Regions:
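Extended alpha-helical targeting/anchoring segments
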Residues: 2-432, 554-558, 642
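Helix-start/capping segments and mature chain N-termini
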Residues: 274, 307, 311, 408, ...
Length: 642
């Protein structure tokens, strides 16, 4: 199969398309495992469909037999793909056989003839021709939604901060008593959900681009995983484990990112937590590894994701001959990164203190092949949808050590769900520029630098040479067909580096220009305020209303009451010979003309926090942008209140 087969099943990012996801939602037994964005080690995505057999374990006593059946089928040439609940690990220790377990399956795997695979670099889709043809035809004829939309999730924590702090205090007692060194303490967030699982997964993977994503249709349950963590990868006799321990929120800009990344790298607490888990996993894999083959290849690397930085380490080992699937999981599962150390005693503490079974959260999702290959994630950042009860659960947790602070740990847990609550739709980067038939581009280096910085921040593909080539073509078209004058040129860059450019004639402003305040209070922690993107619905709606009322722009404040900016301009006031403009940290976009003014010797411009009264009492009020430059504005008399 080549490009032609891939058209209807893949989107332009090389991920499974909305239609393919919708088909997977309608067909129990389907497993999609995706690598996004598809790095060198994770360039292949998989679609397992039409299982030959389903292997389930509903009880602890049934787990071993289920694993043996999977092992047998894989040796006979089948592929196996599915998931294990955290509590499936109780089956490997006699002392856990009486512990609480979830009502959902402890283990669920489909056995398949062969998956459909996608090479993320080439975009080539391959697989059994009958399966590809069947799915393409099914996708073509299925009842489709008009667009992939879903309801907003309103999560409630199943454990209050007070109850969490009570459990946290008991963990500290166990640490002081020497029972444990670290406990990964977790709880659930829950929400009502009756919309499309496929649409929600499509939005989740836009918001959290990871190498170990999964969509698993178990029937009444659907698992949506955006896990960044590799549990283990098997390649013949070579094993790789990559525990993740250590988290910090990303900044709002590249500069803040650098500060946060350095803070995590230099955190003694996080390094100590990571080292504990590395030692635990070295011991676990050592049970099935050739003597002397276990080594730590990398320690405490910092990896960047959409909303957080994570610290990871990489462990490699060579398996002993004859080690099969049951023994691998018996030795490794669950991952020590989601238990703590020492593992067995800590699992007992977790069972005592956590209020409900974890289920598939902190379990694992992945596949085995007949060629002794396997990839499994640690099922964090994983949403479990129960279609019968029309509900969704999302687990969160953190590693608690002796110097942890309970309030901070609770906040870290909630942080890990932030990507579900942000605006999850895809977006592009924008630059709105001025081109003049006599002077050419205005502030072009400022525009390109800002787009490059935002592209780096969000992980967009950016090529300065390609952009300049596109802009040269625009100039040729304008000179050939549009005549003299000034033009508004709007450039949009999408995540994969595709460029779209539109232009229109820029008319002169006539008469006095007026502005008013917006009633909205913006959150200065919203990272999208610091980048010019298509994700600007509030700005567009407020500007449209203001223009209909005859205003040039509408001015915003943040939740602290500080002035930020206009919907299409930055704000300045003049006091004597000095111009003042709000600092970026208030929630301000680094406008290109604003940046030009701050670096110019012609104007005395400095940053200062401003409030509505400062604007109302200023000697003069201005707004500025790259299209209009510096524009003197005023409040009409009837709008002279904040």
């Amino acid at each position: 199969m080549g490009r032609k087969a891939a058209v209807s099943l893949l989107n332009r990012d090389g991920l499974f398309s909305w239609e393919a996801l919708q088909w997977a939602e309608q067909n129990p037994g389907t497993v999609i495992l995706e690598s996004n964005p598809g790095d060198a080690a994770n360039r292949t995505s998989f679609l397992f469909s039409r299982p030959l057999e389903i292997v389930r374990a509903e009880t602890l006593e049934g787990v071993q037999g289920a694993l043996e059946r999977i092992d047998q089928a894989v040796q006979e040439g089948c592929y196996a793909a599915g998931c294990l609940a955290y509590e499936a690990g109780y089956a490997f220790e006699q002392r856990f056989l009486e512990k609480k377990t979830p009502s959902a399956p402890l283990l669920w795997f489909g056995l398949y003839e062969r998956p459909i695979t996608v090479d993320r670099r080439s975009g080539i889709l391959e697989g059994p021709s009958d399966d590809v043809r069947y799915i393409r035809e099914s996708v073509r004829t299925q009842r489709r939604s008009i667009a992939p939309s879903t309801q907003h999730l309103h999560f409630r924590a199943a454990v209050s901060e007070a109850r969490y702090l009570d459990a946290f205090a008991k963990v500290q007692h166990y640490i002081e008593a020497g029972d444990t060194y670290q406990v990964n303490l977790t709880f659930k967030l829950s929400a009502q959900f009756s919309s499309s699982a496929a649409a929600l997964y499509a939005r989740m993977r836009n918001a959290q681009r990871v190498s170990y994503g999964a969509f698993v249709n178990v029937g009444s349950l659907v698992l949506l995983s955006c896990s960044p963590e590799l549990f283990f990868r098997r390649m013949g006799n070579r094993m790789i484990l990559k525990p993740m321990k250590g988290t910090i929120a990303r900044g709002r800009t590249l500069a803040e990112d650098k500060e946060r990344s350095t803070m995590l790298m230099e955190s003694e607490k996080n390094r100590a937590e990571n080292l504990m888990i590395v030692d635990l996993l070295r011991n676990d894999v050592g049970r099935i590894a050739r003597p002397g083959s276990v080594r730590v290849k990398r320690f405490f690397d910092i990896e960047r994701y959409e909303t957080v930085f994570q610290a990871t380490s990489t462990i490699e080992a060579l398996l002993k001959d004859g080690v099969g699937i049951p023994r691998i999981l018996h030795s490794l599962f669950p991952s020590g990164s989601v238990t703590g150390a020492p593992k067995i005693r800590t699992m007992e503490i977790i069972n005592e203190l956590e209020e409900s079974p974890r289920g598939f959260y902190t379990g694992s999702i992945g596949f085995f092949t007949p060629r002794k290959k396997a990839v499994f994630n640690v099922a964090i950042r994983t949403l479990v949808i129960d279609r019968e009860s029309q509900s969704a659960e999302f687990g969160v947790g953190s590693g608690v050590v002796h110097d942890s602070r309970g309030v901070d740990e609770y906040k870290e847990c909630l942080l890990k769900a932030r990507f579900l609550e942000e605006e999850l739709d895809d977006f592009g980067l924008i630059e709105t520029m001025r081109w003049d038939s006599r002077r050419g581009w205005f502030l072009l280096p400022y525009h390109l630098r800002r787009m490059k910085d935002s592209a780096s921040y969000f992980g967009f593909r950016f090529s300065s040479s390609e952009l300049k080539d596109e802009l040269k073509q625009v100039v040729r078209r304008l000179r050939r067909h549009s005549g003299n004058g000034a033009f508004r040129v709007r450039l949009v860059l999408d995540r994969i580096g595709q460029i779209s450019i539109t232009h229109s004639r820029l008319d002169l402003l006539e008469g006095k220009q007026f502005v008013r305040f917006s009633p909205l209070a913006l959150d200065a922690e919203n990272r999208f305020l610091f980048h010019k993107t298509t994700n600007r619905g509030e700005y567009d709606r407020e500007l449209e209303r203001a223009e209909q009322e005859g205003y040039f722009d509408v001015l915003f404040r943040n939740k602290q009451g500080e002035m930020t900016e206009g919907a299409r301009s930055n704000v300045l006031i003049r006091r004597g010979d000095t111009f003042l403009t709000p600092p970026l940290e208030c929630g301000v976009l680094a406008g290109t003309y604003r940046s030009y003014l701050l670096s110019s010797e012609k104007y005395q411009v400095r940053e200062q926090r401003l409030y509505p009264d400062d604007l109302l009492s200023a000697d003069e009020l201005f707004v500025c942008n790259a299209l209009r430059g510096l524009v003197k504005v005023a409040f009409p008399e009837h709008a002279m209140t904040a």
